[in-house]
């Protein structure tokens, strides 16, 4: 453990300090140094870790891959996740807390990105995962090579129809969604159509993409519990209107890169828990703030 309670990845030792001018230039890009020092398998992975706030330089988080770093700097990488990205740890909490089984199921990952959610699903027993992302080239190499994973990149989830994703194959009956720069309210109708009953889904609700700009503070962080609740409530109501039942709500064990508290919302056609009203959601948001800040 580091002095601030962080756990660090070990490759022979827990910290790395290279100060030999014959080996390194006076300064190098941080993403290059991570790869050179064998802290990452690729420069692309290094960039993802840096942007996610997982890399410390001289005990300070640096989140820009192109930052020029002195050759003598101490570079630390927080302990590697059991998944290809730490997003998997977020989903793992929901699966455990809500006692959701995905064993043998065909799943949809809306917003696959690196593939943390997909990796979590596979490690939890999923038979197949269809991953969709508007981007390209982000999915971890191990998942690209996994025959259980079908990847559809450069695709906007909002406009995707079942035939274009599954062809003649059966639809997924369990989904996970983690999207950015768009409200979940806009993609939920497509998610409903892309799943077959019982249409179970776990949504990662990111308040900064659900509220108006006036509610978003510095660095894109939604701090007020009232605003966080105001982000969750419309997503839940939209889901209920589409035909989903409420299963549960919890907060993510990890904050977003800028420090946003994120929430995990479980829905399903067979879920029959009473849906929380705004006050109950607000209470959850306040509890999350207290838990994370303690």
Which residues does each predicted region cover?
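Short, glycine-/aromatic-enriched active-site segment of Class I SAM-dependent methyltransferases
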Residues: 207-224
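A short glycine-rich, Lys/Arg-flanked "PGG" loop and its adjoining helix->strand segment in the class I
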Residues: 185-199
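S-adenosyl-L-methionine
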Residues: 136-170, 174, 179-182
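Short beta-strand element of Class I
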Residues: 127-130
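Class I SAM-dependent methyltransferase "Motif I" SAM/SAH-binding loop
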Residues: 111-113, 134
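Conserved SAM-binding loop of SAM-dependent methyltransferases across substrates and taxa
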Residues: 114-125
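Flexible, glycine-/basic-rich loop-and-beta segments that form/coincide
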Residues: 261, 265-294
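A basic, amphipathic helix-loop patch mediating RNA/tRNA/ribosome contacts
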Residues: 24-73, 106-107
């Amino acid at each position: 453990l580091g002095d601030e309670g962080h756990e660090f990845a070990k490759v022979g030792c827990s910290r790395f300090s290279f100060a030999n001018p014959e080996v390194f230039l006076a300064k190098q890009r941080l993403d290059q140094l991570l790869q050179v020092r064998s802290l990452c398998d690729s420069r692309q992975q290094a960039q993802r870790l840096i942007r996610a706030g997982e890399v410390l330089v001289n005990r300070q988080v640096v989140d820009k891959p192109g930052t020029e770093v002195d050759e003598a700097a101490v570079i630390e990488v927080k302990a590697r996740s059991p998944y290809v990205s730490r997003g998997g740890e977020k989903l793992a909490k929901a699966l455990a807390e809500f006692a959701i089984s995905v064993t043998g199921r065909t799943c949809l990952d809306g917003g696959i990105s690196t593939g943390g959610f997909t990796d979590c699903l596979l490690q939890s027993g999923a038979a197949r995962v269809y991953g969709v992302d508007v981007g390209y080239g982000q999915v971890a190499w191990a998942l690209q090579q996994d025959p259980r994973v079908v990847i559809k990149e450069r695709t906007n989830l909002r406009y995707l129809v079942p035939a274009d994703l599954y062809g003649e194959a059966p639809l997924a009956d369990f989904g996970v969604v983690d999207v950015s720069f768009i409200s979940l309210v806009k993609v939920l109708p497509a998610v409903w159509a892309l799943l077959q009953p019982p249409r179970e889904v776990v949504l990662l609700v990111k308040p900064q993409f659900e509220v108006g700009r006036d509610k978003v503070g510095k660095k894109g962080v939604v701090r007020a519990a009232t605003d966080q609740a105001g982000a969750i409530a419309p997503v839940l109501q939209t889901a209920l209107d589409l035909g989903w039942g409420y299963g549960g709500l919890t907060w993510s064990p990890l904050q977003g890169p800028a420090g946003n508290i994120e929430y995990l919302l479980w829905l399903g056609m067979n879920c029959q828990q009473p849906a929380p009203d705004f006050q109950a959601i607000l209470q959850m948001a306040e509890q999350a703030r207290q838990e994370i800040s303690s």
